UniProtKB/Swiss-Prot annotation:
This is Large ribosomal subunit protein uL23c. It comes from the Eukaryota. InterPro entries: Nucleotide-bd_a/b_plait_sf, Ribosomal_uL23-like, Ribosomal_uL23/eL15/eS24_sf, Ribosomal_uL23_CS. The keyword RNA-binding applies. Keywords: Chloroplast, Plastid, Ribonucleoprotein, Ribosomal protein, RNA-binding, rRNA-binding. HAMAP family: Ribosomal_uL23_B.
Amino acid sequence: MVNSLDMNVIKYPIITDKATRLLANNQYSFIVSPKSDKPTIKAAIEYLFNVKVVKINTAHLPKKKKRIGQYLGWKAHYKKAIVTLSEGDTINLFAEEN
């Protein structure tokens, strides 16, 4: 069973050109909590979306310098997870309007 901490594992899906190309291979990209591990991510995805996860690839992406005018700041580091689902399972990321 998934506890309340697992609900904070998945932050939001990634919607980029590469992520939309991966949808053809039944792979979905998410920004996840930096301290989460693969079994926790798998349990959260299976609980939230009611699908079967086959494989998870994760990557820690570093912080980057960002400049806005004369001000220099940092874009925070984050963790990305690419989740491969079993055949026949899908996640509806885009809400369909009637």
